[in-house]
């Protein structure tokens, strides 16, 4: 039997997602970790590490794919850097309103550099997007409601932490129903800052401005922290001319662990298509799975 050539992956960013991505890569037999890319200030303070820790992708050799674990607002810049080096990328960019435009911009860069970018490949957007598409296959006419939580939103929490005056933060997503959500934000305030001013800045951030948002000052965010999250997705629609077709999908998960697992599967899948930028619904689901295609078909079909 020929020796399988492993996919050489670089991890860009080493927060919660980056750490869980390393775990998922170590659990995947078809991957090897080339190294971790961090900010220069973090590299100096990294200490001993199982893998090389560098400040730029150029310092790593033979990278097949870069898994971008940066905050969403830094994803496009990180993707451009990697793609211009001819390195394919996968990310979990989660600002829904910006996905289509970012895909169009990265598509041009990816094609120019003979690489591929898989964007918004977390669980939502990402795997939930695939489920929503499949539900529309089953019932083309109808309504799908996606209800998140209750649970910790990684993207919203990171967005709050970036606001001036916030020392620590937790953003909880509470489902109201029919796709409507309430944001419960808990913050530790930096000394010298006015709570009302900081709370107003949070409520007017793009992550929160369209939802009912409550901001509460707390002594310790760590005392509240739970990385659990979940989703309930329902569709009621029509198959052919038959009414009242009902579908439901539920999951309760550790947020960064699932996001990271899907990112690693995406790192496998993004090496299959021709150059360009893609979302998860554009790539065959079989490409996300490890193993021989014929074996997968026999097992799942």
Please annotate each region the language model reported.
Residues 247-301:
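NAD(P)-dependent Rossmann-like dehydrogenase/reductase catalytic/cofactor-binding core
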Residues 18-19, 75:
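N-terminal Rossmann-fold NAD(P) dinucleotide-binding loop
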Residues 8, 19-20, 27-57, 151-268:
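C-terminal substrate-binding/catalytic lobe of Rossmann-fold NAD(P)-dependent oxidoreductases
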Residues 56-57, 62-65, 72-94:
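Rossmann-fold NAD(P) dinucleotide-binding segment
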Residues 14-15:
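Glycine-rich Rossmann-fold phosphate-binding loop(s) that bind the pyrophosphate
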Residues 93-117:
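Rossmann-fold NAD(P)-binding glycine/threonine-rich loop
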Residues 127-147, 155-159:
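Rossmann-like NAD(P)H-binding beta-loop-alpha module
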């Amino acid at each position: 039997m020929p020796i399988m050539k492993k996919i050489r992956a670089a991890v860009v960013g080493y927060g919660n997602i980056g750490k869980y991505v390393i775990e998922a890569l170590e659990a995947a037999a078809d991957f090897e970790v080339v190294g971790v890319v961090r900010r220069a200030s973090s590299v100096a303070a990294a200490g001993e590490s199982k893998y090389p820790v560098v400040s730029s992708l150029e310092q790593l050799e033979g990278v097949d794919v870069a898994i971008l674990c940066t905050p969403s607002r830094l994803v496009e810049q990180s993707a451009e850097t990697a793609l211009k080096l001819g390195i394919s990328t996968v990310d979990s960019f989660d600002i829904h309103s910006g996905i289509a435009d970012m895909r169009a911009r990265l598509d041009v860069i990816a094609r120019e550099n003979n690489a591929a970018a898989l964007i918004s490949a977390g669980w939502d957007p990402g795997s939930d997007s695939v489920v929503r598409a499949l539900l529309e296959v089953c019932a083309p006419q109808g309504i799908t409601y996606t209800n998140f939580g209750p649970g910790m939103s990684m993207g919203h929490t990171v967005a709050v932490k970036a606001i001036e005056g916030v020392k620590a933060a937790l953003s909880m997503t509470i489902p109201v129903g029919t796709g409507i959500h309430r944001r419960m934000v808990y913050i530790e305030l930096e000394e010298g800052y006015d709570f009302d001013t900081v709370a107003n800045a949070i409520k007017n951030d793009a992550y929160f401005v369209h939802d009912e948002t409550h901001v509460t000052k707390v002594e310790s965010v760590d005392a509240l922290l739970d990385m659990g999250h979940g989703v309930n997705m329902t569709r009621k629609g029509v198959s052919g001319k038959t009414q009242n077709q009902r579908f439901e999908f539920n999951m309760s998960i550790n947020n960064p662990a699932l996001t990271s697992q899907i990112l690693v599967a995406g790192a496998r899948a993004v090496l299959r298509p021709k150059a360009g930028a893609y979302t998860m619904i554009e790539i065959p689901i079989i490409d996300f799975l490890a193993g021989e295609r014929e074996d997968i078909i026999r097992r799942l079909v």
